[in-house]
Amino acid sequence: MKNTPTQLEPNVPVTRSHSMGFVILISCAAGLGGLLYGYDTAVISGAIGFLKDLYSLSPFMEGLVISSIMIGGVVGVGISGFLSDRFGRRKILMTAALLFAISAIVSALSQDVSTLIIARIIGGLGIGMGSSLSVTYITEAAPPAIRGSLSSLYQLFTILGISATYFINLAVQRSGTYEWGVHTGWRWMLAYGMVPSVIFFLVLLVVPESPRWLAKAGKTNEALKILTRINGETVAKEELKNIENSLKIEQMGSLSQLFKPGLRKALVIGILLALFNQVIGMNAITYYGPEIFKMMGFGQNAGFVTTCIVGVVEVIFTVIAVLLIDKVGRKKLMSIGSAFMAIFMILIGTSFYFELTSGIMMIVLILGFVAAFCVSVGPITWIMISEIFPNHLRARAAGIATIFLWGANWAIGQFVPMMIDSFGLAYTFWIFAVINILCFLFVVTICPETKNKSLEEIEKLWIK
């Protein structure tokens, strides 16, 4: 392909607008990986009610159908760092898209719950690989001043995928009788997963490899071409020097460095960010939204419609986060967001306890929690996990943190039905409230601020 960005001459003058357009292009391309994550996160919320009736699922099996994709996700994240360091970020992202496409086809055609679970594990493998590498790719290409906003594109595309899928679920649910939904409708919900996977794969065909990975692989000229297109020739040469200096450190180190004083703190922060992102309650609403709304007294159709409203709020406040992250800062947004999330969870649990769930106020409380999450912990977790680790350990270290993220994701998907069945909705949401309070304390006391810092400057926070 003669016109791909990787084939630009390094001595071509680069304007700020031209450079910015290129940066946004490659960031959006990688961010599309979030569509896969978002689609699968939301699609199962529409399908699970039909699957429960079709296969007479117990709370444990209901959780397993939902959480099975996280099993593959843990494996995918675990191997993504090694594979991407060896073969490049772009090739592994393309592999992730293919795995998800296979999963969508097999899931839609499955004739028993075992096949469905296996198919979802395959899809999880692809999503796990993509979830850590998409943000890593953007982080390694973006200029420091706008890196946070561009890295949050992954979360934005995730939310767009979630929101669009809620509307797809609603459209499918309205396409036939409930009986049709039990036997056929859920298959269409899962089959449409082919669309984001194909889009992701095709877009990756026309974007370049990560300049930092190219420099690491000894392809200095190619790395300089891409950096020149991003920053202009003068800045590109300086950036390349910084990359090469950090890569020299890699030759003297190993993954064991992460467990030494200094970097060990970075690893702990990355892991805790990942855990809090998953266990503060957002995924419970995402995975079980229609079912929770039915428990509040909503009918089948009303539950799907209300979930669509949740999706719209997610999109709006994620866009707001993209605009604020590099202006307000990561730490401030997360501290404010986690405080509000704790308040909303306390009020939601109290409403369930006193059975005050039939009015508009309950929906407002849930939407308030969703908004607080999407403007803070939701997008910032992915950004900071990709920022806080040294260049020579970033992919593998981010992979470790994301393994914990997917492990926590699995636990929520698996055990929330059992928690609701055993404790009821009130105590379940109060548990999430306590976790949000812990998240607030963690952000305020431990998390660093990385706004407007280069990756090399962030590395110096740990290596003193």
Swiss-Prot record:
InterPro entries in the cross-refs: MFS_dom, MFS_sugar_transport-like, MFS_Sugar_Transporter, MFS_trans_sf, Sugar/inositol_transpt, Sugar_transporter_CS, XylE-like
Stored CDD domains: MFS_XylE_like (cd17359)
Catalytic activity: L-arabinose(in) + H(+)(in) = L-arabinose(out) + H(+)(out); D-galactose(in) + H(+)(in) = D-galactose(out) + H(+)(out); D-xylose(in) + H(+)(in) = D-xylose(out) + H(+)(out)
Protein topology in the membrane: Multi-pass membrane protein
GO molecular function term, any single one: symporter activity
Compartments it resides in: Cell membrane
Consequence of gene loss (knockout): Deletion of the gene does not affect growth on glucose, but the mutant cannot grow in the presence of arabinose. Deletion has a negative effect on the ability of the mutant to grow on alpha-1,5-arabinobiose. AraE/araN double mutant is unable to grow in the presence of alpha-1,5-arabinobiose.
Alphabetized UniProt keyword annotations: Cell membrane, Membrane, Sugar transport, Symport, Transmembrane, Transmembrane helix, Transport
Induction / repression: Transcription is repressed by the binding of AraR to the promoter. L-arabinose acts as an inducer by inhibiting the binding of AraR to the DNA, thus allowing expression of the gene.
This protein's record includes keyword NADP: no
Gene Ontology BP annotations: D-glucose transmembrane transport
Entry annotated with the keyword Transmembrane helix: yes
Function noted in UniProt: Uptake of L-arabinose across the cytoplasmic membrane with the concomitant transport of protons into the cell (symport system). In the presence of inducing amounts of L-arabinose, can import both D-galactose and D-xylose. Can also transport the disaccharide alpha-1,5-arabinobiose.
Annotated NCBIfam families: SP
Protein name per its UniProtKB record: Arabinose-proton symporter
Species this protein is from: Bacillus subtilis (strain 168)
